[in-house]
Design a protein with these regions (language model features):
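Metal- or metallocofactor-binding catalytic centers and their adjacent structured scaffolds
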Residues: 1-55
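Alpha-helix capping and helix-coil boundary motifs
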Residues: 4-7, 59, 106, 138
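Alpha-helix boundary/capping residues
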Residues: 15-19, 67, 179
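Metal-dependent enolase-superfamily TIM-barrel catalytic cores that perform enediolate-based chemistry
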Residues: 70-185
Length: 185
């Protein structure tokens, strides 16, 4: 607050001075954890770019180098999860829910449940591609989920898997070969 939005690097320096001394013990050890400053700075940087764009009457896309495409496709992002909806339902469920509202409450712990989750998401939101967030179970089970998605949706539905950098190189090669022609990445 009170900083010049045109001085984004100065704002980053202020955040680094405040939060940049975190050690891994302060943020967790998993590879996808990021330092607090990354999360705080990214939101402030976007706000600054929005302010700058409004001041000079240009869209943020122009500040980032210009428009490259007219649309950005979104992917259904599947997670393994236990029963319970989260959000306003906390860990409870609504037995009267249907469609996506019911699916988001259901467990998704095996290939059949992952397919069910994907069908509900794609039906409710029109997704044209699917990504499974893996690194939760043994790789074989996660690959089986991808194969089940491929069987359920067919070859025209782009599929992706993200094992959260938890598969070894050898595991990635082994299962990557098995999924060749089925997944985008």
């Amino acid at each position: 607050i009170g900083q010049d939005p045109f001085q984004i690097n100065r704002i980053r320096d202020i955040l680094l001075a405040e939060f940049g001394t975190e050690k891994p013990a302060d943020r967790g050890f998993t590879p996808w954890d990021q330092r607090t400053v990354v999360h705080v700075f990214s939101s402030i940087e976007v706000a600054c770019l929005d302010i700058i764009g409004k001041i000079i009457n240009r869209p943020v896309v122009d500040l980032l180098g210009g428009k490259r495409r007219d649309a950005v496709p979104f992917s259904a992002y599947l997670f393994y999860k236990y029963e319970g909806a989260g959000g306003e339902l906390e860990f409870g469920t609504d037995p009267n829910a249907t469609g996506w509202a019911a699916a988001r409450q259901a467990s998704a712990l095996n290939p059949a449940e992952i397919v069910s989750q994907a069908k509900a998401m794609c039906s409710a939101f029109g997704f044209q591609s699917i990504k499974l967030k893996g690194g939760v179970f043994e790789p074989r089970q996660e690959v089986d989920a991808i194969l089940a998605l491929h069987e359920a949706f067919g070859p025209n539905m782009p599929l992706r898997i993200d094992p959260n950098a938890l598969w070894t190189v050898e595991t990635s090669i082994k299962y990557g070969k098995e999924m060749e022609g089925i997944i985008e990445y």
